[in-house]
């Protein structure tokens, strides 16, 4: 049976307030990561971590989460003292930690920023995240409910490829992305599929 390894948080996770989200955590059989929401003065402090490292078949995978600006989407009384930090700046720090300090073979961002915003090109999005950072191999996106029939390849700040995928919403579609690594765990190829 398929299961989750990890999830990030988005605006709808606050629909029943931060206390409502906290009350549901015992039902989740996986952890939550969010690097740009600072929960230090909330009940989620020390529960939602900025990143997690998972080892699968000897491959060290660093995964971090990013969430959308809550102000204007969610009533302040629902997210309380949660502080939103610039996701692009936070991502640069996360990738440095995961790739350079922790020596992860793959770095994945679970994003709830949205794919892109035509009318607001400088608003943090998956496209902007890929372009303005380095060391992210894959961005798995949400928020804008964008259905991509195949992942988008965007160049990062060093001119290297970053895969961005978003498969719509409501669990209607599944995405699958395979990374092929050499014997010394360097990415040599990326395979992409969408399962409808």
Feature locations, PLM:
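Acidic, metal/ion-coordinating pockets
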Residues: 1-195
């Amino acid at each position: 049976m398929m299961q989750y390894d990890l999830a990030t948080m988005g605006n709808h996770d606050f629909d029943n307030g931060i206390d409502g989200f906290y009350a549901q955590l015992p039902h989740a059989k996986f952890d939550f990561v969010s690097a740009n929401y600072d929960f230090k003065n909330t009940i989620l402090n020390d529960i939602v971590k900025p990143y997690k490292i998972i080892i699968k078949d000897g491959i060290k995978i660093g995964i971090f989460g990013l969430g959308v600006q809550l102000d204007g989407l969610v009533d302040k009384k629902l997210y309380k003292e949660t502080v939103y930090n610039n996701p692009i700046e936070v991502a640069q720090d996360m990738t440095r930690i995961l790739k350079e300090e922790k020596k992860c073979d793959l770095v994945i961002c679970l994003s709830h920023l949205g794919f892109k915003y035509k009318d607001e090109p400088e608003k943090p999005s998956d496209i902007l995240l890929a372009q303005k950072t380095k060391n992210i191999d894959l961005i798995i996106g949400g928020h804008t409910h964008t259905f991509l029939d195949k992942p988008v390849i965007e160049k990062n700040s060093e001119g290297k490829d970053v895969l961005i995928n978003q498969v719509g919403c409501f669990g209607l579609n599944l995405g699958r992305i395979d990374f092929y690594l050499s014997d010394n765990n360097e990415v040599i190829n990326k395979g992409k599929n969408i399962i409808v």
